[in-house]
């Protein structure tokens, strides 16, 4: 959906050709223009702006948390490679996007729970829907923006200078209303997978060692 609306501009092209945009109702289709303007990024839908990424996105620094200082708890701890452990309290309480800063440069992780991003990552603060920002960041090639040969690193000032289109708020709201439902379903599936993985990691060693035995099947 993101690629169709914000990269290929399919609804705009359809209206320009006199066709009804596919996969949307009339009210949503009416939000899109039927022509393009020239811009620094090439053709963009008429009335859409072109802005620097930092006009609506902030990459905030995570906080140092050594492994020996972590206390067992339900809060995921994020490094640039993803979840590196768990802690008993969060640094960030609301949903956000984790961006790899050192190590795995430009890695992206969505997290809807309270979490703890450590100092090898950024976390996103945004003035636009987080669902939109997550999809947008995936298209910007952050993983190719390494600025340090010795220790791979992402310079946020280089990210901030990137130019992106700025769709109207009503279109972003329409996009978010669709994608947030899908995102919620994905979050639930991920939580279930984590629960099953925890059960596996807890029970399998006990089964292998003989500490836990399955009931023998009854033979009639």
What residue spans do the PLM features occupy?
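Extended, domain-scale alpha-helical bundle/helix-rich regions
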Residues: 1-4, 8-12, 18-19
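Short, hydrophobic secondary-structure boundary micro-motifs
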Residues: 146, 215-216
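A glycine-rich, aromatic-flanked flexible loop/lid motif
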Residues: 110-111, 165-171
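A short beta-sheet element
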Residues: 79-162
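Non-catalytic DNA-recognition/assembly elements of restriction-modification systems
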Residues: 1-4, 26-79, 169-215
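Charged, glycine/proline-rich intrinsically disordered loops and linkers
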Residues: 14-32
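Alpha-helix initiation and N-capping motif
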Residues: 9, 50, 130, 156, ...
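Charge-rich amphipathic alpha-helical interaction elements
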Residues: 60, 165-167, 220
